[in-house]
């Protein structure tokens, strides 16, 4: 799968040099002359990627762009590159979720491993998101009765409790549970509960571990 590195820096020479270096390393590269330029061309997250971001720029600076992207729900990992390193800036950036903070001039031995780590992190994030998107779509395939059973199963109800709540037999409820598991494709009941919680179906409810 192709990956894209987004380079944000007001220094045209740096952008050109970085684009050349990263292209030679096999990455797709998009360059931006300012933080606002990136916001105006907000990157798609349909492919794995990361952002190489200068700390000091006219207008929005790097940390301010980091905050904006976070509020927009972006999951692109950020690697800061700065010619003026200082400990407070580095600490704030890392605490806010930056992958790394590198100092200009940055060597390939520092840059490429940092990018590889960021890309791996984003690939994991996208895989989790895709799994949740699939889970949401599979829930829509449940029949009304299966959805009722599903709602009780993820709250830890036994077959007997579910049958009492819905007015059916344990045998019928067990059959519905089997179909729910087949349709939603979790590896276990524990994963079913975890997925349901991550897509917001449990709210703040306290859920016990479901029994088989």
Feature map (PLM): residue ranges:
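Acidic, metal-coordinating helix/loop segments flanking the phosphotransfer/catalytic sites
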Residues: 31-50
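Basic, Lys/Arg-enriched C-terminal extension of HTH/homeodomain DNA-binding domains
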Residues: 181-212
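Active-site residues of response regulator receiver
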Residues: 54, 82
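C-terminal output helix
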Residues: 86-88, 102, 106-115, 161, ...
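Recognition helix of helix-turn-helix DNA-binding domains
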Residues: 158-191
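Receiver (REC) domain active-site loop signature in two-component systems and cognate sites
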Residues: 57
């Amino acid at each position: 799968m192709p990956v894209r590195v987004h380079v944000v820096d007001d220094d045209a020479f740096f952008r050109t040099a970085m684009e050349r270096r990263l292209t030679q390393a096999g990455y797709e590269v998009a360059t931006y002359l300012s933080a606002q330029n990136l916001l105006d061309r907000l990157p798609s997250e349909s492919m794995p990627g990361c952002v190489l971001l200068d700390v000091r720029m006219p207008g929005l600076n790097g940390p301010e762009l980091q905050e904006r992207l976070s509020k927009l729900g972006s999951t692109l990992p950020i690697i800061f590159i700065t010619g003026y390193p200082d400990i407070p800036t580095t600490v704030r950036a890392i605490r806010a979720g930056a992958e790394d903070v590198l100092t200009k001039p940055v060597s390939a031995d520092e840059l490429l491993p940092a990018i590889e780590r960021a890309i791996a992190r984003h690939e994991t994030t996208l895989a989790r998101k895709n799994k949740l998107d699939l889970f949401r779509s599979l829930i829509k395939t449940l029949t009304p009765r299966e959805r009722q059973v599903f709602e009780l199963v993820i709250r830890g109800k036994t077959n007997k409790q579910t049958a009492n709540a819905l007015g059916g037999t344990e045998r019928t409820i067990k059959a519905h549970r089997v179909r729910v598991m087949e349709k939603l494709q979790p590896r276990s009941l524990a994963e079913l509960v975890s997925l349901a919680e991550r897509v917001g179906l449990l709210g703040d409810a306290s859920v016990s571990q479901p029994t088989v």
